[in-house]
Amino acid sequence: MPTQETIYEVADRVATITLNRPDKLNAWTATMEAEVRSAVEEAERDENVRVIVLTGAGRGFCAGADMSLLSAVATQGLDKDVTRRIHSGGAPQEGLRPDFQRKFSCFLGLAKPVIAAINGPTVGLGLVIALYCDLRWAAESARFSTTFAQRGLIAEYGMAWMLPRIVGLPDALDLLLSARHINASEALVLRLVNRVFPQEGFAATIHEHAVQLASSVSPRSLGVIKRQVYTGMFQTLAESFDLSVVEMVASLQSEDFKEGVAHFLEKRAPKFSGR
């Protein structure tokens, strides 16, 4: 389906979703949101896709919500359409925790890993979206800010829950209350990002690492481990332990387990089926 504000590509078992408003530093709009959700759902359904990458066109990842919308709300007030968009999420999914069915937390409920390839400025809502990705890989030029307090806003869309769990409570409060800007080096120290790569050739480097992830480990294991980790955030140790036993028994009966042992013993590259 033709898109207006995103680009969707699949290559080497990696689906890349590119936010495509480079002249606006990929500021977030209702159209972009709908297209990203559709692309993510398509990638999740596609058996040829094992890893999802979310990135931005041009020199930015996402500059947050489009300022024309914020300006309109500031001068004209909230209307029903804006209020509906604030509350909107995807269609309910049976068997999936409500925590993983909100507007952006739906990324956590996907079976496939989502990598934020942060190629430049990432602020406000853009940072919220990056937090809900499983891995955050940044270019040296990336800059980050929560921004909300500088706009008279609050920690939006669950950021007050996610950010402390990623960087710790003291640093989360620092970033939220001050809304200060940090560079990629400090973001790495804070563990806001997992890795920092050179700016030159960033997109190609990210694709190379994503392909490595897609080809070297079991997609079944990726999905189960991801679910274990995020579900574990709401469990006791005993509950997490018991779930791991159930999943261990299932994994020992899987085709990917047999292939995992076989490729190691035969000293060859794995050919995982995801089953």
Where are these regions (language model features)?
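CoA-thioester-processing core
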Residues: 103-111, 117, 123-176, 205-210
